[in-house]
Regions:
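Core structural elements
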Residues: 48-61, 79-92, 110-132
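Acidic, turn-prone loop/beta-hairpin segments
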Residues: 67-94, 126-219, 226-243, 247-249
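TRNA-recognition modules of translation machinery and tRNA-sensing kinases, especially anticodon-binding
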Residues: 120, 249-252
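Catalytic adenosine-cofactor/nucleotide-binding cores of aminoacyl-tRNA synthetases and other
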Residues: 1-78, 176-181, 228-230
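Short alpha-helical functional segments enriched in proximate histidine and acidic residues
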Residues: 25, 60, 99, 122-123, ...
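Conserved structural-core and active-site-/substrate-pathway-adjacent residues in large, well-folded domains
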Residues: 19, 53, 119-120, 165, ...
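Short helix-adjacent coil turns
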Residues: 100-107
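Conserved alpha/beta core surface patches that mediate binding of polyanionic ligands
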Residues: 7-11, 110-114, 118, 169-177
Length: 253
């Protein structure tokens, strides 16, 4: 940007039109060791990135309205998928804190965004919708995924707070699950919200599960495009699995 060329993007205008957190997100997403570039297109992408993170919190908060400490499920009693996502968010917590400590803010926010897009939006949140919306309110299946959502909320709101400070505080003040702990997210500490896993999370097994899931979804999509079926609910899936795959499906399915 150059004042003489008249291509300067005013931070105050960005603040006024898009909000302080999107300005903060743009700054944090850029490697400060290299040239920082701003344009309407870059700020639009930053806004999209922000909305993805914010919408993730909206989903989580909306599905914890009837959840309290007495509803928590012990880790060993949780559904296997819910154990997996707890392991993933705990791993993210360690990685992001390490990146903050090394001032790698752009890598930290990238990891947070990718987690919201991939592990949550692309896998976990989509799978648990049936349990959240169709199971009995106090059923183990529903309380199990709510326990994991509660853990994700507690960790994720703290992870975004150094960058998306206003959003993190808004989330904190909105949620009784959070504001009952401290008056502000910035007065809270990172606690161990779930005991360290006593169960070995085999990443290779979960990788295979998701590969099988993707293959099934691809076949269903092809059948929808051919007008063989109208939607996934019209399909009956038979999986011809190897002995190893069958063992994994029985264990984690």
């Amino acid at each position: 940007q150059s004042k003489s060329l008249g291509n300067v993007v005013s931070p105050q205008k960005v603040w006024d039109s898009l909000g302080a957190d999107i300005l903060r997100l743009w700054v944090a997403s850029t490697d400060f060791r290299s040239e920082m570039v701003a344009s309407d297109e870059i700020l639009k992408r930053t806004s999209d990135q922000y909305r993805r993170i914010r919408n993730t919190f909206r989903f989580i908060l909306g599905n914890l309205s009837d959840f309290s400490d007495k509803d928590k499920v012990m880790f060993e009693d949780q559904v296997e998928l819910d154990k997996w996502i707890i392991n993933e968010i705990k791993t993210l917590q360690k990685e992001v804190i390490s990146l903050y400590e090394s001032f790698s803010y752009h890598k930290a926010i990238q990891k947070i965004h990718n987690f919201c897009v991939n592990e949550l939006g692309g896998v976990y949140l989509d799978i648990i919708k049936d349990r959240l919306y169709t199971c009995k309110n106090d059923s183990l299946a529903r309380r199990s995924c709510q326990t994991s959502l509660d853990c994700i909320l507690n960790i994720l709101v703290r992870l975004i707070s150094p960058i998306l400070s206003y959003t993190a505080e808004e989330i904190w003040q909105t949620s009784n699950r959070l504001n009952s702990q401290e008056d502000s997210v910035f007065l809270s500490n990172f606690d161990n919200f779930v005991e360290d896993s006593k169960s070995n999370i085999n990443q290779s097994e979960w990788k295979r599960i998701f590969e099988i899931k993707d293959a099934v979804n691809q076949t269903i999509e092809e059948m929808r495009n051919d007008n063989t079926i109208k939607g996934s609910l019209d399909s009956i899936v038979d999986i011809k699995a190897t002995a190893d795959d069958m063992s994994v499906l029985k264990k984690l399915g």
